[in-house]
Amino acid sequence: MSALVPEAFSAMVTGRDPEPYISGDDWLLRLPRLVEESLSEWDLTVDGEAMHGMAALVLPVRRHDGSKAVLKVTWPHADARFEHLALQHWGGDGAVRLLAANPGRWTMLLERLNGDRDLHEVPIDEACQVIGGLLRQLDHPALPQLSRLSAEVARLAKHLGSGAPAIPRRFLEQARALISDLVTDDVIDSRMVHTVLHYWNFLAADRQPWLAIDPKPLAADPAFAATPALWNRWEEAVAGGDLRRHLRRRLSIICESAGLDEERARAWSIVREVQMALLGGRGR
């Protein structure tokens, strides 16, 4: 393995089954060549230590004119296949700016943000206001290439009907009822939604205080996007002794800042939590 690829990242990707393109092991064998080809294609020089998330290697680089950027090389998986299109469509409006992309290699050249500063360390109410404000800024019409939320929840409803031993039936029935109601609204597939707007997916920037990164875009209801802000910072959520009130406050702040219907966002949060529980029960 190349010195540019951290061992921790290799360990994270090793053993992954194709989703649906290539296994983690096979991709790791190709990764050093992908990096070298991308550095050559865009005339880049590595300018710092590699970073990574769950499914992508990120290298700080300098372009031929000396300007700073990052090279992102993603393990091919379905959720990320249209990331470059979403970033291109936003054009830097609320999200990291796309400088170049090679979809065949699953590589992107992106503006460099402050990777050491994310919303995880910002006071929770302020962080939720930032998330809501960027949800409003990222509100653009859906691209025709994107997968549709209506199709995703139709598949989910079928799974809910077959039951799940680890999940109380009342939760499954509640999620099914909510889906039946939510899909009747014309907004269901209308907007391009960043579906993983949790605190680590916002980085500090120079041209505005915060920008979103790592979109997993979906043609969806904007209210679907609020749920990930409920998933993290759990110690704060339970510290006050009233978990429900704390989570509802987070959601309320986000919805007020984003201009979203809070009841609709709450309904989607229940559906998404049940969906996550089902995936967890299948070893995902």
Give residue ranges: language-model regions.
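Active-site acidic catalytic loop and adjacent metal/ATP-binding pocket
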Residues: 51, 56-62, 70-71, 98, ...
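An alpha-helical support segment within catalytic cores of ATP-dependent transferases
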Residues: 26-39, 143-195, 205-206, 256
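A conserved alpha-helical element in kinase catalytic cores
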Residues: 32, 54, 65-109, 117-138
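Active-site Asp-x-Gly
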Residues: 205-252, 259-262
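ATP-binding glycine-rich phosphate-binding loop
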Residues: 26-30, 34-64
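Conserved beta-strand elements flanking the ATP-binding pocket of the protein kinase catalytic core
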Residues: 48, 59, 96-102, 266
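A cross-family kinase active-site recognition segment
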Residues: 2-7, 11, 116-173, 190, ...
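A glycine-centered beta->alpha junction motif in the catalytic cores
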Residues: 64, 76, 92-93, 104-124, ...
